[in-house]
Structures are given as C-alpha cells and as structure tokens.
Amino acid sequence: MKLKPGKLPPDLLQKLVEGFVIHDSVSIGPGIGFDSAVIDIGKEYLVVTSDPITFVTEDIGYYTVAVNINDIAVTGAEPSFMTLTVLISQEDADSEKVSKIFNDVRNTAREYGISVIGGHTEVTPSIESTITSATMMGFVEKHKLVRQDGAKPGDVVVMMGLAGVEGTSIIARELDLSGSFSTEEIERMKNFYRDPGIIILDKVRCLKKFTTPTSMHDPTEGGIAQAIHELARASNTGFLIEFEKIPVHPLTLKLSKILDFNYLGLISSGSLIATVKESEVSRISCPDLKIIGKVTEKSSGVKLLRQGRVEDLPRFPQDEITKILA
C-alpha cells in the first residue's frame, strides 16, 4: 500500500505498535491518540513524548520546543527535560543557520524552565530541508494525570485558542499572498505562531485551576477534526461538535476560502481540546474557553452539527496544509 504524506492510517499504525515489549512500570504505552507515554516512578509519573518538525523552514528551533511542551502539558504534567535531534540538510549547512536553531531552542527552553540534556546533530544529504525532533519529559502527581482515553458520555467538550493558527502562520510564511492580503494582514498571519501563539501550557494551567479534565488533546496534524477523532477512538466514545461554536480568526477563515481548504483539518497547535464533567463546567473561568460540543455514546458516531444539520465530522489523515504546500 502506497502511503500518503501525513499521519499513518490509524489501522496500520495500530498494527505497527502492537507487540512491543512493555515494562511493568509503563502505565500508558503506544497507541492511537496517545501522544505521550506514562511511566510509574513511585510517587509521581514520568511523562515522555517525541515530536518532529517537518512543515516549517523558519524558526524551527522554537517550534521544536513548543510542540513537545504541548504534548506534555495535555497530560497535566509540567515539562522539565528534553533531548534534541537536528538533521541538517546540505542546503542549510551553514553555521549561522544552525546557530539560530540552537539559540531559539535555548531561549524557548529557558523561558519555560526546561533543561536540554542531550541529543544528536549531523549534516546529511538524505533530506531536502532541515528536520528537528525532540524528546521531552515531565512529571505529574499521580492523581493529577489526565489521560487521553478518559472522556465519558455526557462530558462537555471545550476549546481554548483558535482553529488553524499554526497552519495559517506557516502558509503565510511559505507562500506569496500579496495578491489577496494587505501587507499588514500577511505580517499578522506570519506572527500567529507568537501571537496568539502555539504553546498551550498557560491554557492547561488555567483549566487545571478549576477542574481536572477527563481528557485533553492538542490538535496538530489534521487539525481540530482529527484531534476529536483521536479522542473519540482513544476513549471509545462518540462526539457531537457544533461547527458554529468553533473559534477561528477572520484571517484564517479568509485564507481558507481563497486557498480552498477546510480549516478544521489545518494544523492547529496553540489550541486546546478538552472534555470536562458537565457538573464542573460552570466553575471554569479561563479567558478564551468555549463550549463546542459534548461526548456521546460510541454508537452515535463522531458528528458535526452545522446550520442545524448533523453530518459526519470529516477526517484528515493528511493535514490540509500538505495540499497547499505540495
């Protein structure tokens, strides 16, 4: 079977991760929708995640730290340590370019109190553009761990942040949009990765002040829609999402119409999807929290309510950005 760019098909991935030897201390191992492993180390859990940066050619050091922070944060853990791998293309084999990557990693890690403890670097002719990847580790008290398979029917689905922020920023920096947007609009979109930003640690911290979510997910490749499908699969439930309640920036909406893509399937680091018990929703006071749906029985499927009509929530095994930047 010829594979397309993007995430592997879930059924194939499930087969690939089956059969690994799992140590007794592993509480959560590899699985669909599980971005982090959880290891029992006694009084706490050690949470471990790995994520590469493949879509971005600028500021990849910042992105590398950011996306791994997010994977740790959605478990309820605080990020603490990371290792870094930098595979440098021959085109980028320049000391100034490499120094910028490391400076961005250093500054971002320092800002969030993360120690970079090792890694690997090399120049390789095997890739067209530089690829970075990190493994990040964090710690969480056992009773505060948030599992991605914890959603239950009746839970409320909430969202913080905006759909497609990361993808909008990448597109604005990779394509010439001057024929459709003003200079000010283009610069605004380019800066989306900083403002409103793609790191969700503060959003998670706010949510945790008021409740312990039953599940959390940071929508990366495949966007909001794919994140919902992954939560549904992990928790063995259905979801009903209200389209009109999903927050999106007007510039992302305009961009989606001009380039003909669905922003629900656009890479969306910077947003947070969580499920919380219905009885706890009213006490949550976080600045940009929106209620966007509810968790249903598995038999109900994963649905989208749009203009009063219920339809299947689309899947995006390949992020919408892949067809734009192809």
For each feature predicted by the language model, list its residue ranges.
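Active-site-proximal betaalpha loop/short-helix elements
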Residues: 90-93, 192-267
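Acidic, Ser/Thr/Pro-rich beta/coil linker or hinge segments at domain junctions
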Residues: 3-13, 286-326
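N-terminal glycine-rich phosphate/pyrophosphate-binding loops that anchor nucleotide-derived ligands
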Residues: 1-74, 156
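Glycine-rich anion-binding loops of enzyme active sites
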Residues: 40-48, 53, 78-176, 294
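Small-aliphatic-rich amphipathic alpha-helix that forms the alpha element of a beta-alpha
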Residues: 57-83, 100-111, 202-206, 226-230
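Beta-strand->loop->alpha-helix junctions that form or flank phosphate-binding loops
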Residues: 28-31, 219-220, 238-247, 265-267, ...
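Short, compositionally biased
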Residues: 169-186, 190
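Helix N-cap motif at beta-to-alpha junctions
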Residues: 275-281
